[in-house]
Amino acid sequence: MPNIPLLDLRRGFAEIEEEVLSGFKEVFATQKLLNGKNLLSFEEEFARYIGTKHALGCACGTDALVMALLACGVGRGDEVLLQANAFIADFEAIHWVGAEPVFVDVDPKTFGPDLDDLRKKITPKTKALLLVHMYGDPADLDEILEICERFGIILIEDASHAHGAEYKGKKVGSFGKVACFSCGPVKNLNALGDAGVITTNDDEVASKIRYMRVHGQVEKNHSHFPGFNSRLDELQAVILRARLKTLDEKNEKRREIAQKSREGLSDIPELFVHPAPAPYKKSVYHRF
């Protein structure tokens, strides 16, 4: 039986090798390894792609989650709703800002939070909902946004599985107050190593994160508040710019494979098969 890898990083890099190596040579020539033109260009291109005012690169998706929570004022004494199948990084981020995670049951049809249980878990201490678009399937955003608005809950999206996913024609990552993306090696939009991006339409949140990722430095060597060392370097920005150009094409291929897999497995009653999303949802099938 042939060995078919789940992900072939070599082939993926070969497709962009010429563009990436050319970009690397330019970075080496300028010796501008951090906070250079490739980072700024990627942030502009990704914000345009998602449909938000701001995109901010950072070191990894976990850092993105921590900084997003802090920028939204989440901290000690607050509760954050989180679906029970979320990745450990979501739990860790809530823990590290001093808040309390409150787990919500999972809806097996959407892999997102069960909305009835979500409503039951809301208390006066509930500050935010950290919503994961699991496996690349957009969550039930209309109902979730209505719940958040009614109870005054901040919506923070974890779209690490969902680069390019759409809900009613609008990109995931543009619905919440802020959204977080991991661009690690196995993600749909992947760097050659760890990387992350934060998107938002909120100018104040964007400003906080922009300085938070560089030790709280509003001016060089002048830290106005405690921050982090969480920068997206120029080399990773070169790679992500190249990959972003073909992201929609790659996601469409994933949808085609998912549909063929669903059809081929549909006659096995004992097998739970990834359900087809609603017609107004466009999944990117990070996992099937």
PLM region spans:
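Glycine-/small-residue-rich active-site loops that bind phosphorylated ligands and cofactors
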Residues: 12, 34, 109-110, 136, ...
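PLP-dependent aminotransferase-like
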Residues: 70-159, 166
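Hydrophobic/aromatic ligand-binding patch that stacks against planar heteroaromatic rings
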Residues: 92-94, 147, 171, 188, ...
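PLP-dependent aminotransferase class I/II
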Residues: 10, 22, 39-44, 49-55, ...
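Short beta-strand-to-turn element immediately C-terminal to the catalytic PLP-Schiff-base lysine
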Residues: 181-182, 196-201, 241
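Conserved active-site segment immediately N-terminal to the catalytic lysine
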Residues: 157-192, 219-224
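Phosphate-binding glycine-rich loop
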Residues: 32-79, 93-96, 103-105, 170
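N-terminal "arm"/small-domain region of PLP-dependent enzymes with the aminotransferase-like
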Residues: 1-32, 37
